[in-house]
């Protein structure tokens, strides 16, 4: 009320830890009731993972579908996520190991699509826990965080502590800072690509887009690559699924073609 906000708590029960998952749901419901916040939850509708999709991607898709539905039903204009600074550092390091481009090195965005916000993205896990203890608020930890089945957990439990001890005690803060720098540079590139996409340089017809090979060759290679990426994703029904090698193959094809 102090800030003129109406809060709704939404929790997606993946059901991966059976009884513990149900206990998490009960805990969240109780905590929401304690603070007078409406609470909505849903269990994973279908545990079977579609072919060609990783478990993590499937769980994420279903989780966001649930959150989007809750926001639409309740007229909420923002969806606040709980990611903190350590989550950001882990994501950036994970994407470095995967050989990601700027999209991956940006990590979690503080705001995405003007709807998803991450108010704790610059706050450390330690500070969050300290604040909860000071306020006398109970909390639960996901028991799978200590499992080494997932690569992210191995980074959290093994690699990051090693980097902190042997190389840089502020590695998490530095990775998060790097994400900020990359976001700034990526925003500049994205802005220029958006201008090109809406300019007469690009001709659209049904599910096709065309442009002059001569014009494309005049672009900086970073802009050219991102332009092809944006066009492919914009024309694709799924809006994704193109690897860097796919995009580069199209770029090479255009560059090798006669000007015109």
Predicted regions and their residues:
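AMP-forming adenylation/ATP pyrophosphatase catalytic core
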Residues: 1, 8, 12, 44, ...
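Core alpha/beta nucleotide-donor-binding catalytic domains of modification enzymes
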Residues: 1-161
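Amphipathic alpha-helical protein-protein interaction surfaces
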Residues: 85, 101, 155, 167, ...
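Contiguous mid-protein beta-loop-alpha structural module that forms a pocket-lining wall or clamp
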Residues: 117-209, 215
């Amino acid at each position: 009320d102090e800030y003129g906000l109406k809060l709704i708590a939404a929790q997606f029960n993946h059901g991966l830890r059976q009884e513990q998952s149900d206990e998490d749901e009960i805990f969240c419901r109780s905590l929401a009731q304690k603070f007078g916040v409406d609470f909505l939850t849903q269990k994973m509708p279908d545990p079977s993972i579609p072919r060609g999709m990783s478990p993590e991607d499937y769980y994420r898709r279903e989780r966001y579908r649930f959150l989007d539905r809750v926001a639409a039903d309740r007229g909420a204009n923002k969806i606040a996520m709980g990611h903190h600074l350590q989550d950001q550092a882990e994501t950036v390091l994970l994407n470095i190991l995967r050989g990601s481009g700027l999209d991956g090195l940006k990590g979690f965005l503080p705001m995405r699509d003007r709807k998803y916000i991450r108010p704790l993205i610059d706050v450390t896990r330690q500070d969050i826990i300290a604040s909860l203890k000071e306020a006398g608020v109970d909390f639960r930890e996901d028991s799978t965080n200590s499992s080494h089945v997932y690569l992210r957990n191995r980074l959290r439990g093994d690699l990051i502590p090693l980097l902190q001890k042997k190389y840089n005690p502020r590695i998490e803060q530095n990775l998060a800072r790097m994400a900020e720098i990359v976001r700034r540079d990526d925003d500049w590139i994205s802005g220029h690509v958006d201008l090109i996409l809406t300019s007469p340089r690009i001709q659209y017809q049904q599910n096709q887009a065309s442009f002059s090979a001569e014009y494309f060759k005049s672009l900086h290679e970073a802009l050219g690559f991102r332009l092809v990426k944006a066009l492919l994703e914009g024309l694709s029904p799924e809006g994704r699924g193109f690897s860097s090698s796919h995009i580069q193959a199209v770029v090479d094809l255009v560059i090798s073609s006669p000007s015109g």
